[in-house]
Amino acid sequence: MERAIQGNDAREQAYGERWNGGPGGSTSPFQLPDESPSWTEWRLHNDETNSNQDNPLGFKESWGFGKVVFKRYLRYERTETSLHRVLGSWTGDSVNYAASRFLGFDQIGCTYSIRFRGVSVTISGGSRTLQHLSEMAIRSKQELLQLTPVKVESNVSRGRPEGVETFKEESE
C-alpha cells in the first residue's frame, strides 16, 4: 500500500528528485526523466564565446511551488515527433497533483520557467491561479519550441528595423 508523502518527507523527496534527475516521483510534476547532457557533450554543442553559435541538445524547464523547485533538461531535436514527446513532459493534472503536496491553506507562489536557445520565459502566480498558470505555461512552451531560428532572429536583430527597405541610388 502506497503511503501519502506529506510535510518534510515530501520536501526531502522533492529535493532528491531536483538534483538526481530521477523520473517523476509521487511529488514531481514531470513525467519524463532528466536528460541533461554530460559536460563533454555540452561543450561539443555550445560555444562559450558566441551564443549565436549554440546548437543546444534540448531545453530546460522547471516548476516551483513555494520553496520547492523541480527542474528538468529535456532533449529536443526540433522534429514533430520530438515536439509531441516533450510537450507531454507534464500535464495540468500532474502539476496540480504535485502542487497539492506542497500547498496548504495559505496561498503560495507557483512558477513555471522554460529556457531554449537563449530565450527564457517565466510565468508565475499564486496557488489559487494554478489551473490558469498551467494553461499559459503549455501555450508558452509550445510557441517557444515551435519557433524556427528565422522567427527568433528578427530584422531588428540583424541591424535592420522592420519596414525599412534598402534603395539603390541611381547614378546619372
Curated annotation (Swiss-Prot):
**Swiss-Prot/TrEMBL keywords:** Host-virus interaction, Inhibition of host innate immune response by virus, RNA-binding, Suppressor of RNA silencing, Viral immunoevasion
Q: Which Gene3D superfamilies match?
A: RNA silencing suppressor P19
This protein's record includes keyword RNA-binding: yes
Q: Name one GO biological process term.
A: symbiont-mediated suppression of host innate immune response
* Any one GO molecular-function label of the UniProt entry: RNA binding
Please give the residue ranges the record annotates as the region Disordered. Answer: 1-38
Q: Does the keyword Hydrolase apply?
A: no
Q: What does UniProt give as the signal peptide span? A: none
Gene Ontology, cellular component aspect: virion component
* Pfam families listed in its UniProt record: Tombus_P19
| Subunit organization | Homodimer.
Protein's job:
Viral suppressor of RNA silencing which binds specifically to silencing RNAs (siRNAs). Acts as a molecular caliper to specifically select siRNAs based on the length of the duplex region of the RNA.
Q: What family does the Swiss-Prot or TrEMBL record give for this protein?
A: Belongs to the tombusvirus protein p19 family.
Name-wise, this protein is RNA silencing suppressor p19
Q: Look up and give the organism this protein is from.
A: Tomato bushy stunt virus (strain A23)
